[in-house]
Amino acid sequence: MSTPEFKVIIVGGSLAGLTLAHCLLRAGISHIVLERRSVIAPEEGASIGILPNGARVLDQLGIYEHIQDTTEPLSTAHIRYPDGFYFSSRYPEIIKERFGYPIAFLPRRRLLEILYTSYPDHSNIYTNKNVIKVQSHDNQVSVLTEDGNTYRGDLVVGADGVNSRVLSEIWKLAGNPSLTKREGRGRTIEYACVFGISSPISDLKPGEQVNAFYDGLTIVTIHGRNGEIFWFFIKKLSRRYIYPDLIRLQQKDAEGICEEAKSLTVWKGVTFGDIWERRETASLTVLDEFLHHTWSWDRSVCVGDSIHKMTPNFGQGANTAIEDSAALANLLHSLIKEKRAEKPTDSDISLLLRQFKSQRLRRVQKIYKMSRFVTRLQARDGLLNTLLGRHYAPYAADLPAKIASGCIAGAEVLDYLPLPKVTGAGWNRGHRRSTMYILLGFTGVFTSALAMVVLLHIRDIAS
């Protein structure tokens, strides 16, 4: 008598969900994807950056070549300050030299299309499937959708984003009434973002990026193939919001926010108004920041934005989600291979999910902390960040490359598929430790020096 196959139910046709579907397909593990919306790749104005840690996994899956066909690799970044000072960095080129892959941006919709069209069996991907309940059974789990259907499997994976229904069901199944409140306290909102895509402007060259820093505001532009402009307008809010007291903005607010900033210079003679007037799409969202502690319960687990959410400043949110999917697929492949003719038991799955969190948490924590730091540095949030950004960063050689490299090295890779031919020495270097020590060490020295200057200034005034 043959053993029933192990089946994974992926909730969410997101980047993390579709990447996991590809990973499981290559591992020979049965799965389905349940997507709440009517289409996998909706017409939305967001763009997404693929960095080497995400690119390497997608390359293993045979997907990256399709991304290459539609993107313009970044080579140069320009950083501009409110006083008109600017400097240029070739850190994108350094990243490519170290890891073999460039930093590349494309519309989120296009990336989802690539993931969907390159997946060979669309009968495994269901749309209009809004999951409303997750239930645990003996050695099995099921999900109920709004249309009344029930899907049974051996593991449920929530890849359903910031307001994850699967994660809320996990917290409910855990049976601890205070869990949701405790986890919620770590979910905050301090920034809002208008993101969009605009038609080309001659002074914004393809393959280049501009970061324009203002007090409480960061404007990022990435210039893609044929000059297409992907942009982010990231504004600090008047106060910090903590769950459940979360601000929700309307799309109509985007116009008011952006109209006020039309005169701000982005690069050379280009103002934000020039970019705004050439917009093809634009959307407004608040930027949640959190790193949850409870990722799984029984036979349910979450990946990607469901459990860790970062601002777009550092560009690692999507790539970290890709890594989550790869790490979980590795563990599932290993377990099923080990069990052979037997299906994994509840205790097997429980151990696997603990291993998943243990394996991922430290790396995710580091990337999350670095993302928060970069966001506030760019927004000139407070005196120390203002001085660090203006008077240290421009003279710190390839600091941006060091910071980025530290969060790329040590990335997850699919251990049951061959490594890509594309590679670089950066994967084997110890950038991770040195980057944090450089920043922490300098911050300590800089703070001490700043305190001395302030004390001397006060003494002079007093005398």
Swiss-Prot record:
FAD binds at residues 35, 49, 108, 305, 318. It comes from the Eukaryota. One of its GO terms (molecular function) is monooxygenase activity. Pathway: Secondary metabolite biosynthesis. It is found in: Membrane. It is an enzyme of class 1 (oxidoreductase). This is FAD-dependent monooxygenase nodM. Keywords: FAD, Flavoprotein, Membrane, Monooxygenase, Oxidoreductase, Transmembrane, Transmembrane helix. The chain crosses the membrane at residues 5-25, 438-458. It is a multi-pass membrane protein. FAD-dependent monooxygenase; part of the gene cluster that mediates the biosynthesis of the indole diterpenes nodulisporic acids (NA). Nodulisporic acid A (NAA) and its chemically modified derivatives are of particular significance because of their highly potent insecticidal activity against blood-feeding arthropods and lack of observable adverse effects on mammals, in particular the tremogenicity associated with the paspaline-derived IDTs is not observed. Pfam families: FAD_binding_3. Belongs to the paxM FAD-dependent monooxygenase family. The gene is nodM. InterPro entries: FAD-bd, FAD/NAD-bd_sf, FAD_mOase_fung. Its EC number is 1.-.-.-. The keyword Methyltransferase does not apply. Its cofactor is FAD.
